[in-house]
Design a protein with these regions (language model features):
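Active-site-proximal beta-strand elements of phosphoester/diester hydrolases
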Residues: 1-10, 102-115, 149
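N-terminal, active-site-proximal structural segment of metallo-dependent hydrolase catalytic domains
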Residues: 1-52, 57, 62-65, 156
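Hydrophobic anchor at the start of a short beta-strand
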Residues: 3, 73-75, 146
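Soluble or luminal CAZymes and related metallo-dependent hydrolases
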Residues: 10-14, 86, 124-131
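Short amphipathic alpha-helices and their capping/turn segments at secondary-structure boundaries
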Residues: 20-22, 90-100, 131-144
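Metal-dependent phosphoesterases centered on the DNase I-like endonuclease/exonuclease/phosphatase
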Residues: 29, 50-51, 128-160
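Structured beta-strand-rich core segments of catalytic domains in phosphoester-bond hydrolases
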Residues: 35-36, 42-117
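A short secondary-structure junction signal
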Residues: 116-121, 157-160
Length: 160
């Protein structure tokens, strides 16, 4: 199974990049970050035309994630358990059957958090990581094959 993570920075503005990705790498699953589109405006038909099923969780102007796949997933989760409708759309998960095995793929657009002293952004980053850790611990009890991918917004130095 070929799996690709791609920060597209506006899915409606870059269908040509998805076509190029399909033609050069031919992934089975593409995890997209920064779709920057509300769900009702997501380009479902355009994605279908290039050969992919789409699951998405977005909001206008920023954030937003999607999972594009050649085969429809068995199960999809949008956001973490306990997220409110006002939470940023940063996490999507899909479970696929692949060669008689179940594979759960988590795709996130992780908050960058500014710096540790930022009063709102850094706590949101910590909450996202805590939610993800708790989610993975819960999944590990029943799932064998887990993949976490996305734009982690982490750099080892200030040169990002």
């Amino acid at each position: 199974m070929k799996i690709v993570s791609f920060n597209i920075n506006s899915i409606r503005a870059r269908p040509h990049q998805l076509i190029h990705l399909r033609d050069t790498i031919d992934p089975d699953v593409i995890g997209i970050q920064e779709t920057k589109v509300n769900d009702p405006e997501f380009p479902i038909d355009e994605i279908r035309e290039i050969g992919y099923h789409s699951e998405f969780w977005g909001q206008k102007g920023h954030y937003g994630v999607a999972m594009l796949s050649k085969k429809k997933p068995e199960n999809v989760q949008k956001g973490f358990t306990g997220d409110s409708k006002d939470d940023q759309k940063r996490f999507i998960q899909a479970t696929f059957k692949w060669k008689r095995k179940k594979i759960t793929i988590m795709n996130g657009y992780f908050p960058q958090g500014e710096n540790r002293s930022h009063e709102t952004k850094f706590p949101k980053k910590i909450k996202f990581y805590d939610d993800l850790e708790n989610h993975i611990k819960k999944l590990k009890k029943t799932e064998e094959n887990l993949i976490v991918m996305g734009d982690f917004n982490v750099a080892p130095t200030k040169l990002d």
